[in-house]
């Protein structure tokens, strides 16, 4: 059960990141934990640098390194400062295809003092892989980082 996996993972991640002050180390461990627990196709972070998102720690195939504000799923989640669940990436206007194997996606903004400082991006190689359960728990995980 997906929700049980999240419930087990959350306290572990909270303990892990609350004792480490280095952002990159925390992002790397969160990406690894999510990939290991759920077997997602791609899990990673993009960090805001001026008018672009720049690739941070990730688990999975080689990824796009820069995404402009408002472009694709990640750039749109940044612009709108909200979680986006995309059941079929082919149907998302302006989707940036880093990998043709990516079929569905969820992007969760990381906020500091109300400003988006990065996003958590998770891709699945199956359609319709993400729902409000994922959104709720991934948003909580992102509060540990922000």
Q: What do the predicted segments below correspond to?
A:
Residues 10-14, 124-146:
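Juxtadomain coupling helices with adjacent low-complexity linkers
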Residues 89-90, 123-125:
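Anionic group-transfer/hydrolysis microenvironments
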């Amino acid at each position: 059960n997906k929700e049980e996996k999240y419930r087990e993972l959350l306290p572990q991640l909270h303990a892990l990141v609350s004792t480490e002050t280095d952002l990159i180390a925390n992002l790397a461990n969160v990406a690894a934990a999510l990939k290991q627990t759920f077997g997602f196709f791609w899990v990673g972070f993009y960090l805001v640098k001026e008018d672009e998102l720049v690739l941070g720690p990730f688990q999975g195939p080689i990824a796009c390194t820069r995404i402009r504000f408002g472009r694709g799923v990640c750039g749109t989640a940044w612009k709108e400062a909200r979680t986006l669940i995309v059941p079929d990436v082919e149907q998302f206007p302006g989707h940036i295809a880093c990998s043709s194997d990516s079929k569905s996606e969820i992007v969760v903004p990381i906020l500091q003092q109300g400003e988006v400082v990065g996003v958590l991006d998770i891709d699945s190689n199956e359609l319709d892989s993400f729902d409000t359960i994922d959104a709720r728990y991934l948003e909580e995980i992102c509060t540990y980082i922000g």
